[in-house]
Amino acid sequence: MNNNLLIIAGPTAVGKSDLSVDLAKKLNGEIISVDSMQIYKYMDIGSAKISKEEMGGVPHYLIDFVDPSKEFSVAEFKDLATEKIKDIQSRGKLPILVGGTGLYINSIICNMNFAESDKDEEYREELEKIANEHGNEYLHEMLKDIDLESYNSIHFNNRKRVIRALETYKLTGKPFSSFKAKNSIYETPYNIYYYVLNMDRAKLYDRINKRVDIMFEKGLLEEVKNLKAMGLTDDMQSMKGIGYKEVLYYLDGKISLEQCIEMIKQGSRNYAKRQLTWFRKDPRAIFIDKDTFASEEDISSKIINDIINS
């Protein structure tokens, strides 16, 4: 059994889904989504979830399976994805990771080891209180002396991750960063083919803006109203995603519809920028500038030739 793993990554709205379905059909592959928002049920429009029609008969996994009221960790994702990769490979097919959540991708290809089993709810509540009273930056500074690597790699506004890092140190006496890959971060159990799609920034931003407009045309407001009626609130993990938190602000009368739309567009553009920064840090990633190819077919052919000739 070969241990090949194809990855099609890239920023939001760059066009990963269409290419990956085409590749799956040509390479006898099955797709595992690596998108931290498409995991949730009932959240189709705001997450730009691929439709059954767009899947084109290609099996897709780890989409639409988590209740949005529940917490879901990277460690849980890694375990599920790893099992699915084994299953796909055991049937003689090629697993293809598709998405833009860099941490999800790294959890798999770097075989990251998460210390997720132990939790200290009382300490978490204490840290939440500190953050609420003094701010996220104050909480983030607490990491500096005990885990400089996590301090430098975790953004101060990622409160959940900062708290997890502080909690891990309290429980284990070891830095949270030490629970990542045991050896080099670039060592992987797979034979990977890692591609990152990109395009001219102005074109990408235009695609992002148009995608947001289409989301509203498709009924994003109604989708969030339904989620709100189900009891979902802005402090839940799922509702912190771009597109959902802003619509909640609008529905709560905190901002106008115009402000809501512009905030989603700006947030999505900023997210795309962060995604590209993340992918550029990995020397294994091969960037594909879509503007230099005449067609999607040419991109597909290039990737297939790389795999065949490797």
From Swiss-Prot:
Gene Ontology MF annotations: ATP binding; tRNA dimethylallyltransferase activity
Sequence intervals crossing the membrane: none
One Pfam family here: IPPT
Region feature Interaction with substrate tRNA, mapped onto this chain: 35-38
Binding site for substrate: 12-17
Primary enzyme class: transferase
Superkingdom to which the source organism belongs: Bacteria
Any GO BP: tRNA modification
Keyword field: ATP-binding, Magnesium, Nucleotide-binding, Transferase, tRNA processing
Cofactor: Mg(2+)
Site description Interaction with substrate tRNA, residues in chain: 101, 124
InterPro entries with a match to the protein in the record: Dimethylallyltransferase (IPR039657), IPT (IPR018022), P-loop_NTPase (IPR027417)
Binding site for ATP: 10-17
Keyword Oxidoreductase: no
Cell inner membrane keyword on record: no
EC number: 2.5.1.75
Reaction(s) catalysed by this chain's protein: adenosine(37) in tRNA + dimethylallyl diphosphate = N(6)-dimethylallyladenosine(37) in tRNA + diphosphate
Family: Belongs to the IPP transferase family.
Function: Catalyzes the transfer of a dimethylallyl group onto the adenine at position 37 in tRNAs that read codons beginning with uridine, leading to the formation of N6-(dimethylallyl)adenosine (i(6)A).
Subunit structure: Monomer.
The protein, known as: tRNA dimethylallyltransferase
Organismal lineage: Bacteria, Bacillati, Bacillota, Clostridia, Eubacteriales
